[in-house]
């Protein structure tokens, strides 16, 4: 299948909400080992986000039911739920491993612009973070370490190549701060990172470009919402 056909089919699959097929089409595009256009990059991101998002939502629901049944002492149900949760976890792991391989083999080595380097390293951080959400023991530690490393690599490039108001730089700060809060259990670090990103963007609001105004201000609002939430639950830490 040619590059253009794969992109067209990915768009078609998106319209049809057939995200697994959208992923397969975008993997064809990614394997060409050339820098993707902004549109192609976004298609790839949307495809994986939908495929992983549905399962992350399922995992949260099932985990919550498991905890309720456990507290009631319903052992036979807990056994069934546990097996079902593990089935979802193996699907999550497969998707994460899949995109992480695509990133390491094709997308990161082919990235030329600072913007795409930040985008892909951030994505790498995100999918290792998703693994860390459900992994335990050494696997959790490995995923958390890899996530931290990827977010740090993305931040390094973002600080030199992207304006503080750039939506990709802001999105990175948002996700990196969530990683500190949820995975590393470091609310002080999470608040510091989110506040710094928000304040830096506010200070340079005049650099906000017309086309990214909506995206940037939305992410700034999300950073602010998280800060409000974290400050109310951890007043002494934030």
UniProtKB/Swiss-Prot annotation:
Pfam families: 14-3-3 (PF00244). Coiled coil: none annotated. PROSITE patterns: 1433_1 (PS00796), 1433_2 (PS00797). Disruption phenotype: Diminishes colony growth and affects conidiation. Decrease in the expression of transcription factors brlA and wetA, components of the central regulatory pathway essential for conidiophore formation. Increases the expression of nsdC, encoding a transcription factor necessary for normal sclerotial production, ans subsequent production of sclerotia. Also increases the production of aflatoxinvia the induction of aflatoxin cluster regulatory genes aflR, aflJ and ver1. It comes from the Eukaryota. InterPro entries: 14-3-3 (IPR000308), 14-3-3_CS (IPR023409), 14-3-3_dom_sf (IPR036815), 14-3-3_domain (IPR023410). Gene3D superfamilies: 14-3-3 domain. Belongs to the 14-3-3 family. This is 14-3-3 family protein artA. The lineage of its organism: Eukaryota, Fungi, Dikarya, Ascomycota, Pezizomycotina.
């Amino acid at each position: 299948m040619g590059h253009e056909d794969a992109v067209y089919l990915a768009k078609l699959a998106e319209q049809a909400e057939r995200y697994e097929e959208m992923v397969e089409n975008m993997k064809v595009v990614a394997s060409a080992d050339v820098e993707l256009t902004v549109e192609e990059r976004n298609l790839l991101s949307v495809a994986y986000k939908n495929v992983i998002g549905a399962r992350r939502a399922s995992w949260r629901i099932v985990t919550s039911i498991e905890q309720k049944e456990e507290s009631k002492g319903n052992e036979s149900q807990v056994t069934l739920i546990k097996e079902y949760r593990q089935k979802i976890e193996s699907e999550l792991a497969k998707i994460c491993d899949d995109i992480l391989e695509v990133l390491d083999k094709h997308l990161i080595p082919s990235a030329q612009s600072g913007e795409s380097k930040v985008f892909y390293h951030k994505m790498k951080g995100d999918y290792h973070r998703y693994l860390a959400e459900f992994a335990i023991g050494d696997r959790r530690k490995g995923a958390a370490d890899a996530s931290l490393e990827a977010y740090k690599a993305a931040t390094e490039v973002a600080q030199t190549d992207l304006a503080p108001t750039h939506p990709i730089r802001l999105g990175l700060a948002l996700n990196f701060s969530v990683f500190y809060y949820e995975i590393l259990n470091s609310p002080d670090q999470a608040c510091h990172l989110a506040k710094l990103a928000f304040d830096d963007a506010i200070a340079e609001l005049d650099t906000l470009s017309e086309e990214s105004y909506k995206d940037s201000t939305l992410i700034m609002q999300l950073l602010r919402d998280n800060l409000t939430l974290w400050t109310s639950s951890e007043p002494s830490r934030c």
